[in-house]
Amino acid sequence: MRCKDCTRYDSGRTCHLNECVCLEERIEAGVVELNTLARECFGGRMFRPLQRRLRDELNRQPFRFFLGDAHRERWTHWKNRCYGMSERNAAALFLLTADEGLWQRVLWHFDSSGFDFPAIRLSGIHPELYSIYQAAKTISVGGDNIVIEDLAFSELVSDRAFRLILGALLLCRHGEVVLNLERKTEEAT
């Protein structure tokens, strides 16, 4: 990222830090846009179809982290109950609380230390929820259940799931401060 107000800014060069130490302040000041941060989330790993899909999704409508109030309330409630949860698990929780039906399958198989994925029964769930579940599992414990390249194809990952996964990746990478971007976007409109 380039941030002229940062003490680590060196004219014309990108910041050498892996994480912006001023992100919270930059969000509060309104100098970081959610769409820009979303594009940077994938870094140099984006191939053309994913670049195209990301551009189309971000231009279609304003980005929203949560599907609605019920999703926000579920995530907030369980995140607060599991104090000390890692950013990875908080991002996985974000995905798994998006749908009430999926959440009911997961509810008894997690705590602040993580998820017991092998114990979760998925038979009969909608394919869209399966991709959300696999993304949550990948974010939480690693692996290649779903890979960056899969996100480029709407046949594999629906638009709704794509937006949720993007939100989870931002949450995992930058922490809860990115949720303030949604509020800033809403205030601007």
Give the predicted meaning of each segment.
Residues 1-126, 137, 141-189:
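Extended, charge-biased low-complexity segments
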